[in-house]
Amino acid sequence: MKKTVLRKYAQLIAQTGVNVQPGQEVFIAADLDQPEFVKMLVEECYKRKAKKVVVDWSYQPLQKLHYRYRTMTTLSKLDNYEEARWQHYVDTIPCRIYLLSEDPDGLNGINQEKMAKSQQRLYPTIRKYRDQIENKYQWCIAAVPGAAWAKKLFPGQRTSQAMEKLWEAILSTSRVDEDPVAAWDAHNKDLHDRCQYLNSLHLRQLKYKSANGTDLTVGLIPEGQFCGGGETSLQGIFFNPNIPTEECFTSPMKGQAEGIVYSTKPLSYQGQLIDEFWIRFHEGKAVEWNAKVNNDLLTKLITMDQGSCYLGECALVPFDSPINQSGLLFYNTLFDENACCHLALGMGFADTIRDFQSKTLEECRAMGVNDSMVHEDFMIGSADLSIDGVCQDGKTVPLFRNGTWAF
């Protein structure tokens, strides 16, 4: 891939993604797959006058070894230096960049019970820090190719060819063209206009139906709103949390979901794939489910904590999105969630409450935003999906027909 194109991508992440501010610290989480691109990204952050850029390197095979050999006690606690780093996040509010490149099958064979229990025990410690920085900092999730991930998508290609093809797919769907910043400005306007229309309807329910058996009604929060594209932090800084993104999303009312929904794409979760599954909801709670592939892992996800069996997000994405038109199944939620409509199990978003800036997290949760240690998107969009919105006055408005926008 040409360095000039990769440089545009690095500039897009630093400028349009996290919007690095002069004097701000930047934390980058990345795997070992793309050191040259990470170097380029670090330089772009410094060009925007970042105070300090720290790269937190990871390597998926080591994660697998940690879960194999470490005790539950050491997996379930933060050491003093780790807590100090979280406190540093609270004190300095750095922007954070996450570069995804992991092998979708990289954690196959791991002890799922050990992983789930250690995460459950660790969560209360992390949450006390996470809640203090919620909506205060800029963050951006983007992707770079990893060798195993590329071979998963293009198994018939040599590794170098597969990596090049994955780069092309990432850059194309991320709108890295002649002028990526201008392309994202136009894209953000389109998403914001659609959200504005959805919010003008004052919806109280979404009704999903598809020929695959999906028949689900989800209640919405009266004080809620649809969001999409870039957003503004509590510090007043505009940023784009996902590159790419195609969604208009909201957090539903906890306790108000009735019916059944079928997945339409595999879900990559904890380095493994869950596929061909359905979930039945009653009074908002997942009460029955089954997956043909990795049902035990789906069960671990849904039962992770008290909130993981409730919905945290309803996202509207047209089936003819650029990602779906690519014809690729990415085996990566960042991309696959933006291929079609999806729901999320677990944590909801406080910023989907109107005037959330003037409210506490506890107030947002009391209004109906779900709380959980997990937030996992699963795809439900199809070529025949229809979604109707029910307004507060009982009027029904078509939102989606044949898998795409009806307005």
Give short role names for the model-derived ranges.
Residues Q11, N199-L201, Q270-Q272, G307, ...:
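Short solvent-exposed loop/turn micro-motifs enriched in small/polar/acidic residues
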Residues M1-E258, G389, K395-V397, W405-F407:
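Active-site bordering "gate/hinge" segments
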Residues A286-Q357:
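Dual-mode signal for accessory low-complexity, basic/Gly-rich regions
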Residues E362-F407:
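Extended hydrophobic packing segments that form well-structured cores
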Residues Q256-E258, I274-E276, E283, C309-E313, ...:
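Active-site lining segments that contact anionic ligands and/or coordinate catalytic metals
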Residues Q205-Y208, F277, V287, A383-C391:
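Short polybasic amphipathic segments
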Residues G109, K152-F154, L273, L301, ...:
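Short conserved micro-motifs at the rims of enzyme active sites and ligand-binding pockets
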Residues T250-Q306:
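Long, well-ordered mid-to-C-terminal structural blocks that present hydrophobic/aromatic surfaces
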